[in-house]
Amino acid sequence: MAQFYSAKRRVTTRQIITVTVNDLDPFGQGVARHQGKALFVSGVLPQEQAEVVLVEDKKQYARAQVKRRLTDSPQRQAPRCPHFGVCGGCQQQHASVALQQQSKRAALARLMKREVDEVIAGVPWGYRRRARLSLNYQPKTQQLQMGFRQANAKAIVDVVQCPVLAPQLEALLPAVRECLSALSALRHLGHVELVQADNGPLMVLRHTAALPAGDREKLERFSQTHGLSLYLAPQSEILEHIHGEAPWYTSDGLRLVFSPRDFIQVNDGVNQQMVRTALEWLDLQPEDRVLDLFCGMGNFTLPLATRAAHVVGVEGVPALVEKGRENAALNGLSNVTFFHENLEEDVTRQAWAKHGFDKVLLDPARAGAPGVMPHIIKLAPRRVVYVSCNPATLARDSETLLQAGYQIQRLAMLDMFPHTGHLESMVLFERRLT
């Protein structure tokens, strides 16, 4: 007769060990050594000793949680945010900005197998001009939760302040919470998005059921009182403009109008420096033809057009192409054209590419641009500037250019998101003369 039984559950004793952290990875985790492999410990800095509990032990690495910190690094600082350590937004407020930049710079250098020439950074606090806050009504407490997701969890951390937000947006948080809590439809609210445009703040409210007329009136009064533009989003694809003027921001002195749904760089200060650096690295001449791939609505494209003979911007999102054309017209630029194309296809076959390009700029998403790199090589531009939000895909794509005879002339780390593990960068490639 068959015997059915439950196997005894294997119990693993959580081992407590004492370690000294000797490095910080780009995500803000301390790195120590244990039994010949890397041990990652959140919350511990280089030169600090701590008692830790092993929570994961793999063949190549292990992870641990801090039980007790025994020493403090001179680079340790008190986090400004009361939610740090619970909120998933920031991972490195306990480390000095200098240490954060040093660890990211070192990580980029390792991946690119080259020293980093410069760090492009702005103010470390109050830099975020965009934030999406989750909303959730709690029937038991009859309170509306408004905040960011908890680290490694779906739970919402109710935020009362956020020091990385632009000061104008952080100041709005209590008033936004009070306004939304007074709505009769507060059980049907999904999230609220706040954006600081150059011409003032805007708010987008995602709601999952129709708002009563009284709620709409309350929201409109709120937007008028606080001088912000208001948009309602009854569905993810629908955006209803209720109050205020269309938002815009500047890039190298040019005005770019955008929709709340459009991608814009979160850190305005670093974006301005990044655009100026790209213009400088490309060494634009009045006769140059320039190609801007993954151009969005013209963050780089339009400034390029003020210095070159002709610029072509290519983008895979039709709405951004239309916005780029609109912004070119608003700025009186007639030497720039925008095209909607599938960037995985051979762009060199397009009619607009038949005259070739002297310089190329690309700013792809995290997946990088593996399908585009061979086409850039076909175009044979003298200089290429690659702006990246993922150093791993940048390193991969760079190999294609290096093997084709290009050389890295400049490498910069962009500290676009201080106190987080995000690492952005930009590289200048120059074709080697034969």
UniProtKB/Swiss-Prot annotation:
Sample GO molecular function, one term: rRNA (uridine-C5-)-methyltransferase activity
E.C. code: 2.1.1.190
Boundaries of every TRAM domain copy: 10-68
Positions with a binding annotation for [4Fe-4S] cluster: 81, 87, 90, 162
Sequence positions that bind S-adenosyl-L-methionine: 265, 294, 299, 315, 342, 363
CDD domains: AdoMet_MTases
Active site: 389 (nucleophile)
Catalysed reactions, semicolon-separated: uridine(1939) in 23S rRNA + S-adenosyl-L-methionine = 5-methyluridine(1939) in 23S rRNA + S-adenosyl-L-homocysteine + H(+)
GO biological process: rRNA base methylation
UniProt superkingdom: Bacteria
Keywords: 4Fe-4S, Iron, Iron-sulfur, Metal-binding, Methyltransferase, rRNA processing, S-adenosyl-L-methionine, Transferase
Similarity comment: family membership: Belongs to the class I-like SAM-binding methyltransferase superfamily. RNA M5U methyltransferase family. RlmD subfamily.
Stated role: Catalyzes the formation of 5-methyl-uridine at position 1939 (m5U1939) in 23S rRNA.
NCBIfam families hit by this protein: PRK13168.1 (NF009639), rumA (TIGR00479)
This protein's name: 23S rRNA (uracil(1939)-C(5))-methyltransferase RlmD
